[in-house]
């Protein structure tokens, strides 16, 4: 698949470093070239349908209306 245009401004290229599968939702950690980790929570079904595996190159797309913040 080739993306020719998209309206999401915040995009991070990276490589999947870890996938924590849950029964319904899974966490996917993507490491950017600068070493930052972007974590996405998506459905486990989407992980399977997208063929996501550790080591796969991906693009994380972040829409401002879908960003959550947690304390650490």
Residue ranges and their predicted role:
Residues 1-72:
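Non-catalytic connector elements of ABC transporters
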């Amino acid at each position: 698949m080739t993306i020719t245009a998209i309206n999401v401004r915040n995009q991070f290229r990276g490589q999947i470093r870890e996938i924590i599968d849950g029964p319904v939702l899974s966490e996917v950690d993507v490491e950017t070239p600068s070493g930052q980790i972007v974590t996405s929570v998506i459905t486990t079904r989407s992980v399977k349908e997208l063929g996501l595996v550790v080591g796969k190159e991906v693009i994380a797309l972040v829409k401002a209306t879908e960003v959550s913040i947690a304390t650490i």
